[in-house]
């Protein structure tokens, strides 16, 4: 991906006593400093900071800020950009007005009074003139690039799927993070999987950064354009969902249930299709009702069922993607162990490359990777390992290609399930070890009676406060920690005994346990886990999450450490506020 500014400019957080907002028409989250860095450069901000202490009337500064404000409001509003592209006369008048303001600043210069100060003003004016000229030239550049893109890409998809309009660009400037950097040049919404490779190749020839996008539910900013010369390829029209099929996978001697999906299929639809056939789709992230299959693969998504069947990687039989070279790549798992991939001594994959038409085979490769490579000892999923032993597509967040479809292995859910909700009111340090105790007990129970822990989720007190959690215990007040888990098996008595023992473990750690048997009651227990959007409301609607993996034995230490950081930062903020009074 391209970056919006030089790294040095981003890291050089020069002393900025306040997020100054002197630039007019700036209704974005960017401060004056950030706008000046983008339009004029770091040197201009240094000059402005120095001249700010030497203002007399401030008129020249106001006129300069008006110039920057006019440029900025157009740059951040695709509708204004389209209007100015369609009206050359209006655009010419705007540019003339910008030059007029700069000329008025020029007239107010007094080199005879303070030559050093005047030299800085001259340097600032030169940077502003360059910015206005670049602003003027940008319209011709954008118009030409749009013409080339429309001509090139319309050979491979319907012209209505090539979107330059303001609504499409605004809709694709951010994802669930609400972080906005640049508006994409174009949004592509292909009708079929077959169109993908040619579109990718066309974008590469045009010099565009390609950003795959599905449901836009990510909290890591993976679908956010960082450069204006970018094309967002939206896969939401790729919604073909096959029937559940029992097929013999390569290297296996029996048929297994699978389902084929295109990248734009919403995760919950796949889960519903599997459930209708009496089976389970193991990939169930919190965003299942909005996220798409392509993103699940790109992020190697998990969910509560990952305890039992692993993440997306563990459950993929095969997948299809477009490489950055515009070629088709089909990846097929060989000798699938139908369980967690790290339990297999060797995980083998066949990679078949085809040209953009998908008809001519180019080459075939084979990857044989030790299963243990895919997990980190003591942690499980290693979120820092984007290379993942060279396996394409999975956990790459769209950086090595665009996933278009996949075939998944489905599983049989045991007949009886109970959901337990455990509320802990003691100190977090005392409550957290119960997670390890429950896990160890359930893993031993699985070997002894076949009863399985099909999911286990941890909710801390800050999350509970954000989602408005309703305490089930009669104690009142919010718990310090909540655990929600599914216990499942074919023997109803064994499941009931296991659930009771889990509740007993919670009782020994200042906790209380509640068990749900009916499907509706179980769904209510899990409802609070899906209220992730409430966190965004609780944090001023801006949320970037990078996944972290915590070793369970050190969970208590982690919880206390995070709480300490929160308290220290809160106190520091209060002290600074008090000092300003």
Which residue ranges define each predicted feature?
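FAD-binding subdomain of flavoenzyme oxidoreductases
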Residues: 241-251, 257-437
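Secondary-structure transition/capping motifs at alpha-helix termini
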Residues: 204-209, 238-244, 251-252, 276-281, ...
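Glycine-rich, acidic/polar active-site loops that bind/position phosphate-bearing ligands
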Residues: 318, 418-439, 443, 447, ...
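N-terminal flexible segment immediately upstream of the FAD-binding catalytic core
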Residues: 2-201, 218-258, 286, 409-410, ...
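Internal, charge-rich low-complexity segments
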Residues: 324-354, 542, 550-581
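General beta-strand structural signal in soluble alpha/beta enzymes
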Residues: 162-166, 188-190, 210-214, 221, ...
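Flexible, glycine/charged-enriched surface loops at secondary-structure junctions
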Residues: 158-166, 281-286, 364-369, 373-381, ...
